[in-house]
Amino acid sequence: MRLYDFRTEYRENPIGLTEKAPRFSWKIESDEKDTVQTSYEIKVTDENGKLVWDSGKKISDQSVLISYEGEALAGETFYSVEVTVADNHGNVESVEGSFETGIFNQTEFKAQMITSDFSEDETACPIFGKTFAIDKKVKKARLYATAHGVYEVTLNGQTVGDYRMAPGWTSYHNRLQYQIYDVTEQLAEENEIAITVGNGWYKGILGFYCQPNQYGTQAGAFAELHVEYEDGSKEVIATDETWAVKTGEIRYSEIYMGETIDTDAPEIKEGKVVVKEFDKLSLIHI
């Protein structure tokens, strides 16, 4: 018997979970005929090695979406999971995995939704940016990001993550999805973060009558970088009025109308960052 495909909330070793009682799933395979699971035991430990939940041995063939029932999970914390399973042939095997919690309460975000003072007629994509220095050894770094529009983040010139068309299309006034990225290895002593935002579904041309501005008239960015250092200290770098904004080589961008890029000599226009009114309770993690 072998255990495989262990998942927490449908994902393999996820980060940024906001579920306070995450669910665990796994699969079994065996070369023996008519093999079935007869029991399982789940143990969860925190990043300090403390046991926070031991399910005890459960006589059950259930292996899908088993809910965590231990002590309250801490936010932004790494947890290890071990599942031990027995089958009807007397075999006992284990599988390990992990998950990391995120920010449970949206009001704890320090970032602000920022936009620019560019006119509504400006077709070039705004690029929101900030430079910052790090002078201590980094333990881990997580970037929370979303936008009014569709966004792409670069950190020190490298694209962050593999999402495309993030954060996705929702009823933006009610729900705005955000993504979380592990950027630990991308940080250096001197850093530059840049967020390019296209119109997307938020401001872009949609519908039978090809009308823009279905949800708003200004594209915006919302991001928060959480850095934890080896000495235990933490730092948060969040979008606010101290960021800069400019246009770049993407001169026009529409999901259904195409994109124009000028790589030769784009007309760079610098603007002023404007903080936009935004309800953080609409934020949801996917």
Positions of PLM-derived features:
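Non-catalytic, glycine-rich low-complexity segments
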Residues: 1-34, 97-132, 214-216
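Long, charge-dense accessory insertions within large macromolecular proteins
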Residues: 274-276
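Conserved small/polar residues in nucleotide/adenosyl-binding loops
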Residues: 284-286
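Recognizes extended acidic, P/S/T-rich segments that occur
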Residues: 28, 35-78, 84, 88-93, ...
